[in-house]
Amino acid sequence: EIISFKNSYHGSTHGSLSVSGNESKKFAFRPLLPDVKFIEFNDIEQLQEISEKTACVIMETIQGDAGVRIPSTEFMRALRIKCTETKTLLILDEIQCGMGRTGFMFAFQRFGIVPDILTLGKALGSGMPMGAFIAPFEIMNALSNNPPLGHITTFGGHPVACAAALAGLEILKEEEIIKNVENKGALLETLLQHVNIVELRRIGLLFAIELSSPTAVQKVVKYCHENGVLSFWFLSCPESFRIAPPLNISNSDIKKGAEIIVEALDRL
């Protein structure tokens, strides 16, 4: 069996839909993969569902489309221990939260654990299409036979996409962008205190701003777009909208953006 988490989102292909925990995105594509079980996110007691018959657990380190749901360090470490005890592969999906977004190169580093398999995408390609499946040699080697070359792709390793990804990695390292992410996120958070905000959830420079209703969110997003701030509501959490600025955003642009968001909130 495979274990995933309720309200998770892993993509739109057959396999990734099968392990995504939002039925509204899946119903039109059934039947999907069998023997996929969904448990509650960030609930240590639910980890008892993991057993020796569990092939893998797949999880977004930070649930993105569910509205920036951040697990506790206690939960993450208990998950790692349980997977190790049952010889279950732990797969962490950092397609949204990886590449410095949380203030670490990889979000799992915040919790002091290491997965067996890591998936990356989005920011990895620096604007070009690029995804990555990262694992130790023994796991990667298992994919190289039965059948031989059974996992290949026409455009895998595309030179231009790889060059863009490498350039982005070098800039993240050379310009020390990641070390400033937490301070920039904290600055923006202090500027977004408002009576119309029900809850603000943040990790690094990834925010979810929860309002009273999806209608209120749509009004704020529309005003922000019209005034130069790009945002969007979460498809699986429409009462919240996302703020995920560039990691190298300046403090002055943070202040300008916050002013526009506050103006939008004032108009509710």
What are these regions (language model features)?
Residues 1-268:
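Conserved N-terminal phosphate-binding loop of PLP-dependent enzymes in the Aspartate aminotransferase
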